[in-house]
Amino acid sequence: MDASMVPRVPHKVGVVGYGRLGQSLVSRLLAQGSELGLELVFVWNRDPGRMAGSVPPALQLEDLTTLEERHPDLVVEVAHPKIIHESGVQILRHANLLVGSPSALADQTTERQLLEASNHWGHTVFVARGALWGCEDISRLDAAGGLQSLRVTMATHPDGFRLEGPLAAAHSSGPRTVLYEGPVRGLCPLAPRNSNTMAAAALAAPSLGFDRVIGVLVADLSLTDMHVVDVELTGPQGPQAAALPCTPTERTQPSLALSLAPLLLQPSGTAYWAAVSFPPDLGSASAEFPPLPLLSP
C-alpha cells in the first residue's frame, strides 16, 4: 500500500489550564484537530467547574497525577508557572511538554529538575515565545557570539499587571512609571504572568540568560487596551563588528488582561494553535515555539 494511503495515527494532546488561552486552544482542537492529525485527550483546570458545559465530560481530567492514563504525546501548559514548578517533572515522565509560562524556568531548581527529567525519560521541553518575535534571529546572533546585551521592555495599563511580592504594593507615580528594571531572573517571581516574553528572550539567548537579559516593566496609564513590547539588541562594537551595533524594535498588540472582546484572543490563541498543530518533536517544526536545546534529551 502507498505510504500516503496509510491512515495517520493522531498525536494525542493534553491541555493544562482552561483560562482564555486554554479555552481558545481547546475549542480549535475540538473543531479542527482531526484535520491535522491531532486528538485532544484531556483538559485539566485547577477549578474544574470552569470546564462545565464547554468541555465534554469524558475529556475532563480531575486529577493531573493520572494524566498517564490518557497516553498523551504532548501536554500544553497554559495555566500558571506554579504548574511547571509542581507538575513539570511528572508530565515529562509521560509526554513532551510545551511550556506556556516560561517565567517558571527562571527558578534554577525547576530548570535543573526539568533537564534531568527530560534526559531520563526521553521527552522534550518546548517553550512558548509569547509576544517575542524574532526569536530565531536572537538565537542565531547569540550562537554566533554577536550578542552583547538584550533588553526587553513591556508596558501596559497598571490594571493589566498581576504582581506578587514587593511589586504587588507598587503604585504608579505618574502617567508612566517604571515598576522594575533589572535582570529577568529577579522579575519572574514578582510578575510571573507578565514576564513570559522576557523569559522567552532569556532562553533564546543562553549566553546572557536570565541573569544578563534585562527586563523592564512599565505601568502606562495611556495604554488602556493594549501592551507594547520593545526589544533592544546590542551587538559587538569596533571596526570588525557587524553593521548593527544597536537594534531597537517595538510591537504593539491587544492586551488580553484588559480586553473583553473575544476577537482579541486571536493573536495569542493563534500562536499556541500553530505550536500544537506543528510541534517540533512530533512533525513539522514551528517557528512560533522553538525548542529549548538544553532541555532536549
Curated annotation (Swiss-Prot):
Name of the protein: Aspartate dehydrogenase domain-containing protein
Keyword Phosphoprotein set for record: yes
Keyword Membrane carried by entry: no
A Pfam family the protein falls into: Asp_DH_C
Residues recorded as bearing Phosphoserine in the entry: 24, 172
Single biological process term from Gene Ontology: NAD biosynthetic process
GO molecular function, one term: aspartate dehydrogenase activity
Keywords noted in UniProt: Phosphoprotein
Family classification: Belongs to the L-aspartate dehydrogenase family.
PANTHER family linked: ASPARTATE DEHYDROGENASE DOMAIN-CONTAINING PROTEIN (PTHR31873:SF6), L-ASPARTATE DEHYDROGENASE-RELATED (PTHR31873)
Organism of provenance: Rattus norvegicus (Rat)
